[in-house]
Amino acid sequence: MPRRTVVVLSATLALLAPGYASAASPGPDRTGRAEAVQPPWRPAPGTTWQWQLDGKVDQSVDAAVYDIDGFENSAAVVASLHAKGRKVICYVSAGSWENFRPDAAAFPASVKGRSNGWAGEKWLDIRQLAVLEPLLGKRFDMCRDKGFDAVEPDLLDGYTNRTGFPLTAADQLAFNRMVAALAHERGMGVALKNDVEQTADLVDDFDFAVNEECAQYSECAALTPFTKAGKAVLHVEYALPTGKFCAQTRKLGFSSMQKHLNLDAWRKPC
């Protein structure tokens, strides 16, 4: 939706290193040869897209990529979009607990913080990597099993918000790199959602960016490391009309559009 640890030291230091991969990452097989890994899907700058999290997915929208709710949509919806030549992104929250999701009871009270401003949601203590990794892994399993091409993990910028936990920039880097590794282990691409301040640190770990309102907050230039690396920036504005941002974001190579705040099917692309 739109919105602006207890771990041993050695594990935390490993996570802070670029290119972190968890113990489940592919490695040498029993013969000592490295296992072949299919490169994750990576949208190119300028790719057209649709982002719909509210209501039944309107599959008639002319866009190369659809970003839709991973829980609310079935494998049949993903397959139908694939049959139309679309790539499909699985929206899930990574940084918040949601009381309306089927796995809500699996999250212990110790990781739940303050409300993030949305009904039924609370920030997560992203320092607790050992607790959150298997929970998020199961969500990403769902995305993979439904056939999604990539994941949009929401709320990867908790350290800049009032979460109820003393989160640091280093905590966020460690968590975000873990999230990226979980997607890659499952053969899916992964988006850096917002977290503009850490773009330069994370561009090598993520396959594309999803951003809300960089024009509104004069932050779009900070996202150019993605387009310079040949990776799409999928961008929306809510309050600004297209005439206020399209000229700028076209020059930057972004995939920009105006959307309603509830992210229904309506869109006005640049």
What does each model-identified segment do?
Residues M1-P26:
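Secretory targeting and sorting signals
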Residues R4, L9, D29-C270:
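Glycan-processing catalytic domains of CAZymes
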